[in-house]
Amino acid sequence: MHIIKTLISVGVAFSLSACLSLEGVEIAGLEGKSSGTLTKYRCENGYKASIKQRDNGVVSIAFNDGKDSYVSYLNHVPSASGTLYVNDKNTLKWHQKNNIAVFTYPDRNYAKTGQLVTTNCHKY
């Protein structure tokens, strides 16, 4: 009986450790296929990102940091140059011009530092 309780505890711990942890990002469920143009990018920090155009000036961004995957929705906002999308919390920004984008996202310690990090991403 003790072994079974230990195995259950270990299983719960592994399940919880697999949860997404990036602070300041809304984690959305992955939805089924929908219409829209999908564009893929590789970022200088090692991230891979996919941007999908949605309705009403909204894009979904899916990105992977090599460990965890995230999905969020960003709204189009006016920009002097290129196309800019921002989430409601202003913690994710995707500023795209031609085949290059600047991706701004929360630092891993965002809850403590409030710092955002930026990387350049290239369409492939």
Curated annotation (Swiss-Prot):
Enumerate the InterPro entries for this protein. Answer: MliC (IPR018660), MliC_sf (IPR036328)
Covalently lipidated residues (N-palmitoyl cysteine) read: C19
**Membrane topology, as annotated:** Lipid-anchor
In terms of domain of life, where is this protein from?
Bacteria
**Protein's UniProt name:** Uncharacterized lipoprotein PM1176
Q: What SUPFAM superfamilies has UniProt attached to this entry? A: YdhA-like
One Pfam family, short name please?
MliC
Its cellular-component GO annotations read: plasma membrane
Q: Which residues form a coiled coil?
A: none
Where would you find this protein in the cell? Answer: Cell membrane
Q: Which coarse location class describes where this protein primarily resides? A: membrane
Alphabetically ordered keywords of this record? Cell membrane, Lipoprotein, Membrane, Palmitate, Signal
Q: Which residues form the signal peptide?
A: 1-18
Q: Where is the lipid attached (S-diacylglycerol cysteine)?
A: C19
